[in-house]
């Protein structure tokens, strides 16, 4: 199969490309490298076609998407803090850029699987959260993700095959600081022999899902016969940010205590995914637990000290 992957030099996109190449698929990668890193593509650099450009460039997108079987749309501006500072640019990239992809995909009759976000639910009291629960985004970034979902709904009614994956807190190798990378930040502090820095009281609850599981959800969505749907991509299990920090400290064997900082504006208090629909319709389920992965990651950090 032939695919375009937008945002392919980023965290999730680069892992997705590796899996597609391993399957024998032909992959074209589009990334403007604003936050993506070309070194993320090093393992597959000789097996892909890389184009440095922007999803807002309609004609470039159109030329790349002609004669492919599908598009994995991972490109986005993702920093919640930056979204308060430059909301117009976030809308332009995340919403207008996505609509370009939907328009062209509809024209060519190809399927799109794209990155949505659990942030569309906002601070909900309904836990675990299902795909049909109320959407109350609390920051400009999350609002752009909800607008993308509304566009998907609109284009699906006009014949586009499109699946939106509402990622919860994805973690794993190559995670960027921009991508809500609390685990990466904590591990970097431990590597320096320093205590993790926790925003606010640390009682924020998170549902962490490994990047390999997110990749599998993308591929299952593309290969499925489902024409239009939204799926939560999480684990049905949660941990507080403070407990996460203490777990990393425990695995490190260092005598440290987390340092608390002021809370961050736009930070959702609790996220927990109900993944029943993804399990039933995609036959998908997460395979990597955060605790097991962290034990290995902290060991790697200690070995590199």
Language model: regions and residue ranges:
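Hydrophobic alpha-helix immediately C-terminal to the catalytic Tyr-X-X-X-Lys motif of short-chain
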Residues: 147, 151, 155, 186, ...
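Non-catalytic, hydrophobic alpha-helical segments
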Residues: 214, 218, 233, 244, ...
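Conserved C-terminal active-site "lid" loop/helix of NAD(P)H-dependent oxidoreductases
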Residues: 211, 261-286, 296
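Glycine/proline-rich active-site loop of Rossmann-fold NAD(P)-dependent oxidoreductases
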Residues: 146, 161, 170-185, 194-195, ...
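PAPS/PAP-binding and catalytic site of the sulfotransferase fold
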Residues: 240-252, 293
């Amino acid at each position: 199969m032939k695919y375009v992957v937008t945002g392919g030099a980023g965290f999730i996109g680069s892992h997705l490309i590796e899996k597609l190449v391993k399957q024998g698929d032909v992959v074209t990668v589009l990334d403007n490298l604003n936050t993506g890193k070309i070194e993320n593509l090093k393992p597959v650099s000789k097996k892909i076609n890389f184009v440095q450009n922007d999803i807002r460039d309609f004609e470039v997108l159109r030329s790349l998407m002609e004669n492919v079987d599908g598009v994995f749309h991972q490109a986005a501006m993702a920093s919640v803090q930056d979204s308060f500072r430059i909301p117009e640019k976030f809308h332009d990239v995340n919403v207008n850029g996505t609509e370009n992809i939907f328009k062209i995909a509809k024209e060519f009759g190809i399927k799109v699987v794209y990155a949505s976000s659990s942030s569309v639910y906002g601070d909900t009291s309904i836990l675990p959260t299902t795909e049909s629960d109320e959407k109350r985004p609390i920051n400009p970034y999350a609002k752009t993700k909800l607008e993308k979902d509304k566009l998907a709904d609109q284009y699906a009614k006009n014949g586009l095959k499109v699946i939106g994956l509402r990622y919860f807190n994805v973690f794993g190798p190559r995670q960027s600081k921009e991508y809500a990378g609390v685990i990466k930040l904590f591990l970097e502090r431990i590597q320096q022999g320093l205590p993790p820095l926790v925003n606010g009281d640390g009682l924020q609850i998170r549902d962490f899902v490994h990047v390999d599981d997110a990749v599998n959800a993308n591929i299952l969505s593309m290969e499925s016969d489902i024409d239009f749907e939204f799926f939560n991509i999480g684990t049905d299990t949660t941990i507080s940010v403070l407990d996460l920090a203490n777990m990393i400290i425990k695995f490190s064997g260092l005598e440290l205590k987390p340092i608390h900082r002021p809370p961050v504006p736009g930070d959702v208090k609790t996220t927990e995914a109900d993944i029943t629909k993804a399990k039933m319709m995609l036959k998908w389920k997460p395979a990597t637990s955060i605790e097991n992965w962290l034990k290995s990651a902290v060991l790697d950090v200690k070995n590199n000290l």
